Amino acid sequence: MATLIKTLAAANQSERVKLKIPRSVQETIPIRRIYTNGIWEVGRKHSRSWKLTDVNYIAASQETQKSIFKAYCGALNSLPTDATAKITIVNHRLNPAEFERRILLAYQDDWLDHYREEANRIMKGRAEQSNNLVQERFVTLSIPQRRIDESKAYFKRAEANLQKTFARLDSGIQPAMNYDRLRILHDFFRPGYERYFDYDDYRYMSRAKDFRNLICPDGICFKRNHFEFGNKFGRVLFLRTYASFVTDDLISDLTEYARDLILSIDMIPVPTDEAVKEVESIILGVETDITRWQQRQNSRNNFTAEVPRTMEQKRENSRGYMDDLTQNDQRMIFSLITLVHTADSLEQLDADTESLIAVGKEHLCDISSAKYQQEDGLNTALPYGLRRLHALHTLTTESCAVAIPFRAQELQDPGGLSYGINEVSKNPLICDRKRLVSPHAFYLGVSGSGKSMGMKSTIMNVVLGTDDDVIIVDAEREYGTLARAFGGEVVEISPHSTHHLNPLEIVFGFEDENPVAQKTELITSILEQQMANGAIKGSYKSIIDRCTANVYN
C-alpha cells in the first residue's frame, strides 16, 4: 500500500491549508490570487480552466455512442498524472426577460408588427416545452503551487494535449479566462443579478480592487446539512456508493433537473506502474488469506472444503482489475462526484434533494448530503480546482467514463433565427447562418414531414427579423400567397404569362471585361446542347461571334 498511499498523499498534501476563521464573506472564497492569463492560486495549488463544447450523445445511434465513449476513455487516459482534473457541468436557468430577448422578434413599428406578434406567440408556445436551462461544461486542471512561469508553461502543454484528445470527441476546447471563471461564481452567488456582471482585468488590477467583492454574496452561513447565502438556500450532495453496474445516463439524468445546480467530477489519475504494484499487493494479500484458510481446514482434516465465495470473489475482482490495467490499456483513477443545488426556500431545497436522491436510487447509487462539510463540499463542487471532500472511489478508466458529461449540443446564436426545437433538451434552436463558413442550408425529409412548412417559417423569420432580400424560385407555385402577404412581388414565368426572361439582355453600368463575349458563350452552349457533341466547329463559332457582335452593334 505504500506506493499508492504516497500517490494519494501527494494529492491530499496540496489540499491541506491552515485553518483560518473567515472574518468576512470575501474570505470564504478560497481564491488567493488571479493572473491575467487565467491561472488562479487557490489554497496551495494553481488551477486553469477550459470550456468544453457539448456533444450530441443522448440522441446518437448506439454505434456513435460507443465511438464517443471510447474517445472519452482515451481522453481520460491522456490526463496528466501529476495533476488533478475536474469536469464541471453548470446548470443555470435563463430569466424570462433574457429568454425572450434571445428568441423573440423585435417590434419595429411598421405594418408587419402584427405578423411579428403572431410569430412571437408561436415561439412562446414552443418555448413552454423547455425548462429554460442552459448548460456549460468546463474542465479544470490543478497542480501543486510552483513559480507562475512554470505553471504557465505546464498549462500551455496541457492545453495542447486537451485540444488534441477532445477533438476526437468533436468537442472543442476554449480557454476560460478570468471573466468566464468569475462569471460562473458571480451567477451562482448572486442569482438574479447576472446582467450586472462586469469584469475587466486591467480595470480591477490598475485600481487595486478586490475581485471577490464582485462575486461574493451579501452573506453566507454554513449549517449542519445546508448553507444559506443572500436570500437563497443551498446543499452539497456527493455520490457515496456506486452500483455494481452503472449506466451512462446517470450524469445526464442528474443535470437535466430543472434547477440551478453545479455538478463536478474530480479525478486523480494514478501512474500505471504504481497502480500495478498496488493491485499486485492486493492479489498477494488475497492469496495469502486463501492459503491460510486452507491450512486451517487441512489442520482439521477437512481436505475437501471449498474456498468461501467472498474470498473467491475478491480473487476474481483483483485479477480482473489487473487485466484491465495490463491488457486493456486502462488506468486507475480516484474519482469523486459532488453536486450543489440551490432553492428559494428550505422546503423547496429539501424537496429538490429528495428528487435528486431518487434519481440516484433509480441507478442503484447512493447520493448523500455532506453533513458538517457543506463548506468543504461547496469548495469542491465549484470550479476552483479544489477537492476538500475525501469520499473517493477507486475506478478504472471505463468505470470512470460511465459518468460521461455529454448530453446534447445546443444551438443558440445571439441575433439568430429560430429553426425549431432541440429534440433532447427542448430548447429553441437559434442559428445565425451568416456566421458559418458555409451559410447554405437544406430541408431534407420524406413526403409530408414538413419541409415546405419549415421553409415558409424560415422565410417569415428572415422577412420579419432582418433587412435581407428573399428570392424564391417556386416551381410548385406554393409561395405566392406568402410573398403577397409580406408585400412581395410575384413574377409568373410560363408560355402563357405576360412575363418573359430575355437571356441576351445586357444591363449596362456593370464593370465587366466584355459582356458581348459572355453572351456569345451562352449562345454557343445552347446550340451545343441542341446539336450533336462536337458538331459546332471552329468556323461555326467564328460565325456565331460575328453575328452576336453585329446584333449588339
Language-model segments: which ranges?
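Switch/coupling segment of Walker-type NTPase motor domains
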Residues: N56, E63, T88-F99, D113-E117, ...
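Short, well-ordered alpha-helical packing segments
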Residues: F69, C73-N77, K156-A167, H186, ...
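Conserved structured core elements
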Residues: K66, L133, K156, I333, ...
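Glycine-rich nucleotide cofactor-binding entry segment
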Residues: G385-V437
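Extended, folded cores of ATP/NTP-driven motor/assembly subunits in large transport
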Residues: M1-F406
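Structural beta-strand/beta-sheet cores of well-ordered domains, especially the beta-sheet scaffolds
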Residues: H46-R48, A83-A85, Q135-R137, D218-F238, ...
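Glycine-rich phosphate-binding loop of nucleotide-binding enzymes
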Residues: W40, R48, V55, Q62-Q65, ...
